[in-house]
C-alpha cells in the first residue's frame, strides 16, 4: 500500500498543485476556540472570521489547491463513513463527523471566491477527481481486510492530508485560505494521533509514509490541539 499511495500522492500534487514555489512566511490569524479534540470546526465562528478577511486575487495554484482539498477532505469523510459501517469502531464515526466540517470549511472558500464546487451533490464514494476516485476504492479495499488495517488506512489518510496541506500552504498567501488550512491541519494532527492510539491498542504499528519520522513523532507526542 505504501508504494501505491506514494505514487497517488505524487499524481495529486503534480496534477493539482503547482508546489514548486518557495515557502512563504505567514501571519497566523488568532481566533476563538474553534476546534475540539476530534477537530470538529465551529463553522459559524469560522465563517465570521473568513468573511472579515479581504477577497484577494487567487493564483492558479491556490485555486487548484482549494479544489483538491475540498475533495480530499470528502475522501477522508467517505472512507471513514464506509469503514465505520464495516467495523463499527466509534473513532471512524467521530472523525467522519469532523471531516464533514473540514470539507464544509473549504466549500466556504469556494463560495466566497465563486469557484464551482467539484463535490456538488456527489454521494459517498463518488469524486470528480479520478485520482481520488481510484484512491477511495483502494483505501476501502485495504480497510476492509481487518480493523487494524482500517486504523492504518485512517493514519495514512491523515498523514497524506497533513502533508498536502503543508504543501498547499507554501503557495497560498491569501489570509482566509491560510486560516482555513491552519484549522484543517490542526484537526488532521488530532486525527492522526487518534488513529495511532487505536493502532497501538490493536497490537499494530505505523510508519509515516509522507511526513518525516520527526514530524510524525512530534504530532503523536503532543497534547491534543483544542483551539488557537
Regions found by a protein language model. Give the residues of each.
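All-alpha RGS (Regulator of G-protein Signaling) helical domain and cognate RGS-like helical scaffolds
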Residues: 32-228
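Bacterial Sec-dependent N-terminal signal peptides
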Residues: 3-52
Amino acid at each position: 500500500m505504501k508504494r501505491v499511495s506514494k505514487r497517488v500522492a505524487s499524481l495529486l500534487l503534480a496534477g493539482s498543485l503547482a508546489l514548486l514555489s518557495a515557502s512563504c512566511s505567514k501571519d497566523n490569524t488568532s481566533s476563538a476556540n474553534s476546534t475540539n479534540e476530534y477537530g470538529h470546526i465551529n463553522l459559524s465562528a469560522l465563517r465570521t472570521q473568513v468573511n472579515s478577511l479581504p477577497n484577494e486575487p487567487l493564483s492558479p495554484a491556490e485555486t487548484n489547491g482549494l479544489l483538491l482539498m475540498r475533495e480530499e477532505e470528502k475522501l477522508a469523510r467517505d472512507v471513514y463513513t464506509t469503514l465505520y459501517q464495516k467495523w463499527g469502531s466509534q473513532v471512524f464515526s467521530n472523525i467522519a463527523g469532523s471531516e464533514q466540517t473540514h470539507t464544509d470549511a473549504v466549500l466556504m472558500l469556494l463560495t466566497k471566491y465563486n469557484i464551482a464546487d467539484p463535490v456538488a451533490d456527489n454521494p459517498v464514494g463518488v469524486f470528480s477527481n479520478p485520482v481520488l476516485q481510484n484512491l477511495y476504492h483502494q483505501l476501502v479495499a485495504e480497510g476492509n481486510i481487518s480493523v487494524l488495517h482500517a486504523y492504518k488506512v485512517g493514519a495514512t489518510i491523515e498523514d497524506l492530508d497533513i502533508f498536502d496541506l503543508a504543501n498547499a500552504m507554501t503557495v497560498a498567501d491569501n489570509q482566509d485560505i491560510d486560516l482555513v488550512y491552519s484549522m484543517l491541519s490542526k484537526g488532521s494532527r488530532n486525527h492522526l494521533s487518534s488513529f495511532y492510539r487505536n493502532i497501538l491498542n490493536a497490537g499494530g504499528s505505523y510508519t509515516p509514509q509522507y511526513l518525516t519520522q520527526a514530524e510524525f513523532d512530534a504530532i503523536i507526542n503532543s497534547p491534543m490541539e483544542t483551539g488557537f
